[in-house]
Amino acid sequence: MTHLTLPILEDWEGLTLTAILQEKFHLGKKARHEIRMSQDVLLNNKPLDDWNTPLFVGASLSLPIILHDKIPVYEYDLEIIYEDDFLLVVNKPVGMKTHANDSYETNTCANAVQYYLEKTGQEANALAVHRLDQTTSGLVLFAKNKLAIAGLSWQMENRAIHRTYLAAVDGTWGLVMQTINKPIGEDRHHGSRRQISPYGQPAVTHVKVLENDNENNTSLVECQIETGRTHQIRVHLSGIGHPIIGDTLYGGSSRANRIMLHAEKLHLNHPFKGKEMNFSAPAGDDWVF
């Protein structure tokens, strides 16, 4: 696919192309400039040269798909949960980074997505909309081009994308629901750790208890985050005395050979189709509870 073609919607009535790209698609200045320089925007199948022309309901707008530079491929077959022309949802395995932090890292989830895109003959990029810790398994959302990443990133920044995690923790709970509203900051004494700190960034986690196992003194909980701080769920659960099983960095028991945290559900609005979308992926065979 080389173009995105869609009708002018009612709430776009009278807007110029610049306004639509900026206010509806949330495209930055650089991406808008790339589209302008392509000279490949069509209105009703004819070139649109004047970007100050008001657009009206019933017209058809066609925009060129602008891509980022491709990243190296990693020959790993991911579980694809959903895919269309603009986005892709995968079930990331535990132990795999979401994307590279350095140029030499090519065995990440993003590199595996790029491998899938090229293997299936797609002119697209693997652009992670959010990230999961290397030690966390579950759903990760990828955009395929600059048009898609702009709208999805805007949703992330405005908390319109909701993620739900499954965690197996030490100890049993008396409460069914609990909200943890405690700021998280760096641990000055341990570079890879975070801690609850009055000087940290705001962080809110909602916890729902699904099951108590009194015999083994463990619980299964569901967590929804309003913010996306590093190690947020791990720090918050540890901070109230229920560290995640396998998370020895934050005081969890070593009864599992992985951290028992899985991104189970994902909710978003499609950036172009305008519909709500819900995805889920069960935890893998290495899940212990």
Regions picked out by a protein language model, each given a short descriptive name:
Residues 24, 116, 159, 187-190, ...:
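Conserved, well-folded catalytic cores of nucleic-acid-processing
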Residues 48, 68, 94-95, 103, ...:
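Residue-level signature for short turns and capping positions that connect secondary-structure elements
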Residues 1-179, 260, 288:
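RNA pseudouridine synthases
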Residues 95-115, 149-154, 166-220, 235, ...:
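Glycine- and acidic-residue-rich catalytic/RNA-contacting loop of pseudouridine synthases
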